[in-house]
Amino acid sequence: MAKITKTFQYGKHTVTLETGEIARQAGGAVIVKFDDTVLLVSAVAAKSAREGQDFFPLTCDYQEKFYAGGRIPGGFFKREGRATEKETLISRLIDRPIRPLFPEDYKNEVQIIATVMSLNPEIDGDIPALIGASAALSLAGTPFKGPIAAAKVGYKDGEYILNPTVSELKESQLELVVAGTANAVLMVESEAALLSEDVMLGAVTFGHREMQKVINAINELTVEAGTKPSTWEAPAKNTALISAVQEAVGPRLGEAFQVRDKLQRRDAISAIKKDVVESLAGRVAAEGWNPAELSKEFGELEYSTMRNSVLDTKVRIDGRALDTVRPIAVKTSVLPRTHGSSLFTRGETQAIVTITLGTARDGQVIDAVSGEYKENFLFHYNFPPYSVGETGRMMGPKRREIGHGRLAKRGVLAVMPSLESFPYTIRVVSEITESNGSSSMASVCGSSLALMDAGVPVKAPVAGIAMGLVKEGDRFVVLSDILGDEDHLGDMDFKVAGTAEGISALQMDIKIEGITEEIMKQALQQAKAGRLHILGEMAHGLTAPREELSDYAPRLLTIKIHPDKIREVIGKGGSTIQAITKETGTQIDIQDDGTIVIASVNAIAAQAAKARIEQITSDVEPGRIYEGKVAKIMDFGAFVTILPGKDGLVHVSQISSDRVEKVGDVLKEGDVVKVKVLEVDKQGRIRLSMKAVEEGEGASAE
């Protein structure tokens, strides 16, 4: 196939899609050029599903190569290793809008690989990767109901910005990624500076409107490439099996869904399924039915039973109304030796959140393609198997945990103090101890309380809520504070975090082929009411940060010295700074601009270290009297240390008003004496006098 190219303007950027020259053995492959950021995105689908495959095995891998930024990776092996947090998050970002656009019965393995091969530091790889994934899938001839497109939206001075650069995002009040088809939105991911619901909805519609040119370009590329439509057909429904399962279940599933307790409800449904399997075992064998199909049909019946019930009755499976939030309980200072902690419980979802305060050196150094930087606000989310009453392997964080942690971090980021005003590295850890839906939003609420408990000067309390949707045709209901089953059996997971003032984070994932602006508007308004209710409940714990830090948290003292004096504080081979830290028990960080941060749990020790540094960096003042220690005796006088690292000479003629024949007769090394500074010459040599002090001249040094 000859090389085919499509070029269009997308905001301020020129975008080019190329296919037919590179990776020609892949099902579909596209080079995406977004100005100087260049990605190769491939899509390959297996010819058939594996035997017994009962889920859609879609894998999305986003990878950034260090050569893209003209850098060599660090570490011993000098090559890219396991996926970074950023790569994991963008891999999830690609997966989320693509997965719902494959047919329910399609079980062939599909893999999308997006590789950043050239990186302009001003243009991130997320939007090009999403565009490339959509184009590659469209070219691969899969039963993909796309194409989709994506846009990044910023907001400044009341205006939306399409695909802002990295520099523009630093000044923006919003960073929002929206993806969707020509007709509907499928996914939203955002971080905001406490913006209103109307501004957020406007950003989504703005992004969706602007992305139409991308969809048109992909359609044109696919036509010119002569891509053949997919020949895959969904397997025929086994109507006899479906009728048999429905008859065997009867009204029992509807009754099971009335059980309020999650574990009891699961047990009741499992008992019904077991009975159905046993009662139909003979017929399954006689008819040659696949047992996996029976299990699948039972799941379909679960799905329709719950959905029809809530649509018809407007009552949910735990008895709540559509907009009711589960009971909330909050506690703070639950762990005595942590710097801050909270216990947040909402129904059967629970999180213990802890705060640890450290110094700037405790920040995480990240070796990125665009350059090395340090992260001083860390948010870690852990989801152990016991939280849902299961067993499982305890390994490193999975993709889901990394994604949920990032969302919760976005939720509180807007209220965090700047590093200049609160120079601590802050680590938040959310341990999910129970889960029945919305654990990431429980982490937002719990972290807000724990941060205030730690005395971190956050601007306002933050709460989060997860919304759901059940939609059949023109009928739909929006659910507040969804359960795990409502998430699993519903059509939308819509999470909103924010303060009483506005939204700080919004994430939306749609399992159907998009939702309308009307549904989004209702969900946002319902989420606001729920968020305000939760904030009211959280106020029973704390409403503002504590005035004092924990007794176990480090106290930070910040002083500023002239950069030229840094080497005096460090000393030869680090001797001076090591002596101060050892003798005072403090931790000292020195920055290139002369900022010195002293950390110590003991405030007195921190003050002592500060005094030592001020002594070292202070200038010797002519005419001032100092108390010093005799450092060395010479025939012509004595050297006296008046400040750390600063020695001056008391000439034999300046020791006393009386005649001194031999210096050693009057002074010995280690003697403490008062001296007056007579002169500091151009070479920095200091002339001192004891005689002048005797004669009562000069001012006494403090």
From Swiss-Prot:
Keywords: Cytoplasm, Magnesium, Metal-binding, Nucleotidyltransferase, RNA-binding, Transferase
InterPro entries attached to this UniProt entry: ExoRNase_PH_dom1 (IPR001247), ExoRNase_PH_dom2 (IPR015847), ExoRNase_PH_dom2_sf (IPR036345), KH_dom (IPR004087), KH_dom_type_1 (IPR004088), KH_dom_type_1_sf (IPR036612), NA-bd_OB-fold (IPR012340), PNPase (IPR012162)
Domain S1 motif: 623-691
GO cellular component entries: cytosol
Positions that bind Mg(2+): D487, D493
Start and end residues of each KH domain: 554-613
Gene Ontology annotations of biological process type: mRNA catabolic process; RNA processing
Annotated localization: Cytoplasm
PANTHER family linked: POLYRIBONUCLEOTIDE NUCLEOTIDYLTRANSFERASE, POLYRIBONUCLEOTIDE NUCLEOTIDYLTRANSFERASE 1, MITOCHONDRIAL
Family, per entry: Belongs to the polyribonucleotide nucleotidyltransferase family.
Record function comment: Involved in mRNA degradation. Catalyzes the phosphorolysis of single-stranded polyribonucleotides processively in the 3'- to 5'-direction.
The protein's name: Polyribonucleotide nucleotidyltransferase
Organism: Stenotrophomonas maltophilia (strain R551-3)
Taxonomic lineage: Bacteria, Pseudomonadati, Pseudomonadota, Gammaproteobacteria, Lysobacterales
Gene: pnp
